[in-house]
Curated annotation (Swiss-Prot):
Keyword Cell membrane recorded: no
UniProt keyword annotations, A-Z: Ribonucleoprotein, Ribosomal protein
Protein known as: Large ribosomal subunit protein uL13
Keyword ATP-binding (UniProt): no
Amino acid sequence: MKTFMLKKNIARQNWHIFDAKNKILGRFSTKLASILKGKNDITYTPHVDSGNYVIVINSKKIKITGKKLKNKFYYHHTGYSGGIKKISLENMIKNNSELVIYKSVKGMLPKGSLGRVMIKKLKIFSGESHNHEAQKPKKLLT
């Protein structure tokens, strides 16, 4: 019997919804990355995008352990000389909590074209409501 290899045209992708309230950032992100890759399906194939769509609500209420709120910094560069900027995790959660989960999950996905396709399937909202009710997302236990 031959090994089953999933083809792109027969891959079925479902929508799942997760509540980030009181979830630990790293453990929560690994679960999301695994579902985006498609590892929770029996038809997982590494080179095909078989992952599901993921909706995250309540990103503002995610839990950070230890002293990371004060000691963890995110850096970016404007492109100008002396243009390095840094922001603490505490300020990032206050200003743009969606970006914290986005960066955490993106770091756990493949670093190529397949990873760029997978990260587009992650939809993050800071509040309770989202605009994907039409897709009828299923709630998975985490």
